[in-house]
């Protein structure tokens, strides 16, 4: 839990929920904090013990502790962009999220869209800008129209995102997004119902969870809406059975084509009655306010079962 990004506190919440809900008759869990400057375990009485980064071990009261599996709840870097996955793969330590390549790919919105287009996945119109490039508002408007969304290309939880309604807002929005990443993506506005689809590997099967409809009190599903109660999250979504099956099948298709494992949560907007893919989150939030645990509950899966299945799947991989 933890990480190096703006999502640090969200990750801590997720990690604590997992820690609390693991079956103690099967697992002996430790709370591992991975921060920019230090890696440590929180022991009894909240005592920190430093992690040996050369082999991911810790010594507590003279006893060397090694780990059979890592439950990865880090959002953003390094847990969601492939860095932690690559490190653990080198050490031959199983972990619960997707592998290095899938993690790096899905964290990069530009690359992910490029990979998915050959499979017929509909997306918003998009325009990409690298830091240092000239930003041409007229060219952007000609490509994606107004209103549009300016986003950091590699960031989660809607950090660094602005809904732009006029030409004069484009430059400030790009500067804001560049605070999160050196690449930005500008997307056309899609008017329609926003939904979130969790897809997981559960008991050795790929399972699409009940669909959640997202109704934000803000103009879009930003950080406040996601984590500070500024949205309604309605599970199951108020869409037809046909729409539900269609968006679940697309989410499962993406999961299979990318050779995913672990948890994923894909966001779509039904525009002109067609689901348009927005993004995939491969380390979705697992706090009490998060969508995927709500979906699991709606499917009759307890948190203990959900988290236990993730560990068992990782150990068998």
Q: What are the language-model segments listed below?
A:
Residues 165-249, 270-276:
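Phosphate-binding site of ATP-dependent enzymes
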Residues 213-264, 291-317:
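Active-site "cap" helix and flanking loop/linker of ATP-utilizing ligase/carboxylase catalytic domains
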Residues 1, 13, 64, 105-192, ...:
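Active-site nucleotide/adenylate-binding loops and adjacent lid/helix of ATP-dependent enzymes
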Residues 29, 94-95, 123, 148, ...:
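Hydrophobic beta-strand scaffold residues
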Residues 44-50, 86, 221-228, 282:
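Short, flexible, mixed-charge acidic loops at enzyme active sites
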Residues 188, 197-199, 255-288, 296:
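Conserved metal-phosphate-binding beta-hairpin within the catalytic cores
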């Amino acid at each position: 839990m933890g990480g190096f990004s703006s999502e640090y506190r969200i990750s801590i919440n997720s990690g604590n929920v997992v820690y609390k809900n693991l079956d103690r008759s099967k697992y002996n869990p430790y709370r591992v904090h991975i921060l920019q400057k230090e890696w440590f375990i929180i022991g009894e009485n909240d005592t920190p013990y430093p992690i040996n980064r050369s082999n991911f071990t810790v010594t507590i009261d003279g006893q060397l502790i090694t780990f059979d599996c890592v439950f990865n709840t880090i959002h953003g870097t390094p847990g969601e962009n492939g860095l932690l996955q690559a490190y653990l793969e080198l050490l031959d330590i199983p972990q619960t999220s997707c592998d290095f390549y899938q993690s790096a790919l899905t964290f990069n919105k530009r690359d992910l869209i490029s990979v998915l287009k050959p499979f017929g996945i509909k997306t918003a119109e998009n325009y990409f800008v690298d830091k240092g490039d000239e930003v041409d508002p007229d060219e952007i408007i000609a490509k994606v129209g107004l209103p549009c969304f300016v986003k950091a290309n590699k960031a989660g939880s809607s950090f660094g995102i602005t809904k732009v309604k006029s030409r004069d807002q484009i430059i400030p929005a790009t500067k804001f997004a560049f605070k999160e990443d050196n690449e930005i993506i500008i997307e056309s506005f899609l008017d329609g119902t926003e939904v979130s689809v969790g897809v997981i590997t559960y008991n050795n099967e790929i399972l699409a969870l009940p669909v959640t409809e997202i109704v934000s009190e803000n103009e879009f599903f930003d950080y406040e809406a996601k984590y500070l109660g500024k949205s309604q999250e309605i599970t199951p979504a108020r869409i037809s059975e046909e729409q539900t099956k269609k968006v679940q099948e697309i989410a499962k298709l993406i999961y299979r084509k990318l050779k995913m494992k672990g948890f994923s949560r894909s966001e779509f907007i039904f525009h002109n009655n067609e689901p348009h893919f927005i993004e995939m989150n491969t380390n979705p939030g697992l706090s009490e306010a998060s969508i995927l645990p709500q979906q699991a509950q709606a499917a009759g899966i307890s948190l203990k079962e959900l988290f236990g299945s993730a560990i068992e799947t990782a150990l068998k991989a």
